[in-house]
């Protein structure tokens, strides 16, 4: 049994107005499922079930068993649209998982050994919190690890600096976009402190 399951119903009332009504009157989240050899499907899910599922970070990068009106299919989260102020999910895109066929998914980033550059007097800024990957379903990682043990002050860690797990490709790199992942910089000095030092 899949640890990540979600129940949904097919929706026929489409459009932005319909989606707003779903969210406001029925506490439902509109979504779309596509991919594989089936046509795209417009669905809706209980907002509280979606929120509960996403409490577990691993749900973002695991195969989810989606039960649409009694028909089960395996999917991964492709994209989430969140409310800009409240943060709750307003719309979701799911991609069907087909064995032996590559998929793209969003995977969380885990930073390790952050204490090393901090001990050298540096401060760390995380530029991204997730990475889009392409791989076979069996190779889908739970997270991508970024090791900052050797990062020096003034260093910018790029996507190309990260070793991808076996069988996993970073989508941005495949499109020639070497994203910044984190940077280590010298502590910012408050204006008052800088003036005092100058005197």
Curated annotation (Swiss-Prot):
- Single Gene Ontology BP annotation: translation
Gene3D superfamilies cross-referenced by the UniProt entry: Ribosomal protein L25, beta domain, Ribosomal Protein L25, Chain P
GO MF annotation, one:
5S rRNA binding
Please give the SUPFAM superfamilies that the UniProt record associates with this protein.
Answer: Ribosomal protein L25-like (SSF50715)
- List cystine links: none
What domain of life is recorded for the organism?
Answer: Bacteria
* Coiled-coil boundaries: none
Q: Which GO terms describe its cellular component?
A: cytosolic large ribosomal subunit
Family annotation (CDD domains): Ribosomal_L25_TL5_CTC
Query: What are the alphabetically sorted keywords of the record?
Result: Ribonucleoprotein, Ribosomal protein, RNA-binding, rRNA-binding
InterPro entries on file: Rbsml_bL25/Gln-tRNA_synth_N, Ribosomal_bL25/Gln-tRNA_synth, Ribosomal_bL25_b-dom, Ribosomal_bL25_C, Ribosomal_bL25_long, Ribosomal_L25_dom, Ribosomal_uL5_bac-type
Quaternary structure, per UniProt, is: Part of the 50S ribosomal subunit; part of the 5S rRNA/L5/L18/L25 subcomplex. Contacts the 5S rRNA. Binds to the 5S rRNA independently of L5 and L18.
State the similarity comment. Belongs to the bacterial ribosomal protein bL25 family. CTC subfamily.
Annotated function = This is one of the proteins that binds to the 5S RNA in the ribosome where it forms part of the central protuberance.
NCBIfam families from the UniProt entry: bL25_bact_ctc, PRK05618.1-2, PRK05618.1-5, PRK05943.1
Name this protein carries in UniProt: Large ribosomal subunit protein bL25
The organism is Pseudomonas fluorescens (strain ATCC BAA-477 / NRRL B-23932 / Pf-5)
């Amino acid at each position: 049994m899949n640890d990540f399951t979600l129940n949904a119903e097919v929706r026929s009332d489409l459009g932005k107005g319909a989606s707003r009504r779903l969210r406001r009157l029925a506490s439902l989240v509109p979504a779309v499922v596509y991919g594989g050899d089936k046509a795209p499907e417009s669905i809706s899910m209980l907002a509280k079930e979606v929120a509960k599922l996403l409490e577990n970070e691993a749900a973002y990068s695991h195969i989810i068993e989606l039960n649409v009106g009694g028909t089960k299919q395996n999917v991964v989260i492709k994209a989430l649209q969140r409310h800009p102020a409240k943060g709750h999910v307003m719309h979701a895109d799911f991609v069907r998982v087909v064995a032996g066929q590559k998929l793209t998914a969003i995977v969380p980033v885990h930073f390790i050994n952050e204490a090393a550059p901090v001990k050298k007097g540096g401060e760390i800024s995380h530029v991204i919190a997730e990475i889009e990957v392409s791989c076979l379903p069996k190779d889908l990682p739970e997270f991508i690890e970024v090791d900052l043990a050797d990062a020096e002050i003034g260093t910018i860690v790029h996507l190309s600096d990260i070793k991808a797990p076996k069988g996993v490709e970073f989508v941005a790199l495949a499109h020639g976009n070497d994203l910044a992942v984190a940077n280590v910089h010298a502590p910012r000095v408050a204006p008052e402190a800088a003036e005092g030092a100058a005197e």
